[in-house]
Amino acid sequence: MNQHLLSAAQIIQEGGVVAYPTESVYGLGCDPFNRNAVMQLLAIKHRPVSKGLILIGESLAQLAPYLHLNEQQSAQLEKKWPAPITYLVDASDRLPAWVRGEHRKVAVRVPDHPLARQLCQLAGQPIISTSANISGRPAARNRYQVARQLGNQLDFIVSGACDRAAKPSTIIDLESGRILRP
């Protein structure tokens, strides 16, 4: 197993904030159930808690305890993931309010990037995923851009490549099918 990822997963479990590659850009991640870690991540980004955050997992099974899904919705997600598609799904009461922000739904994804999925697997739970940048600035696409913009505020940066041609993930409301970000 990749020692680099093991270190990042341990830092997440200990309440740290890490940067890691996803399909399109580098993401920032932490333990979604650790309020202090999430608040630290939001402070790094200069992002208000009210906006909510994306939760990624290694599989739908890892995300399911925090979601309200019927069988049809579960089957739909199983067919679509892993992929750079984020769905807005009704959140269960097990998901902290600081992850959802002002919303009753939570944004969730099973990424189509092996390092991001492995990081969730090694952390043993879903993790936060938000672009590695200060809000309003361009998202970082490599570890050097992450280090230049956020380096001394992060506990760890995972090495890896993003797809240079990829766009940020599509966002779809699972219930209505409405595309919120193409």
Swiss-Prot record:
Transmembrane spans: none
Superkingdom of source: Bacteria
Record organism: Alcanivorax borkumensis (strain ATCC 700651 / DSM 11573 / NCIMB 13689 / SK2)
GO biological process, one term: regulation of translational fidelity
Cellular location(s): Cytoplasm
Gene Ontology CC annotation, any one: cytoplasm
InterPro entries: DHBP_synth_RibB-like_a/b_dom, Sua5-like_dom, TC-AMP_synthase, TC-AMP_synthase_SUA5
Enzyme class: transferase
Similarity-based family: Belongs to the SUA5 family. TsaC subfamily.
Name of the protein described by the UniProt record: Threonylcarbamoyl-AMP synthase
GO MF assignments: ATP binding; double-stranded RNA binding; L-threonylcarbamoyladenylate synthase; tRNA binding
Stated role: Required for the formation of a threonylcarbamoyl group on adenosine at position 37 (t(6)A37) in tRNAs that read codons beginning with adenine. Catalyzes the conversion of L-threonine, HCO(3)(-)/CO(2) and ATP to give threonylcarbamoyl-AMP (TC-AMP) as the acyladenylate intermediate, with the release of diphosphate.
Annotated keywords: ATP-binding, Cytoplasm, Nucleotide-binding, Nucleotidyltransferase, Transferase, tRNA processing
A Pfam family per the record: Sua5_yciO_yrdC
Record's catalysed reaction(s): L-threonine + hydrogencarbonate + ATP = L-threonylcarbamoyladenylate + diphosphate + H2O
Record-listed E.C. numbers: 2.7.7.87
YrdC-like domain location: 2-182
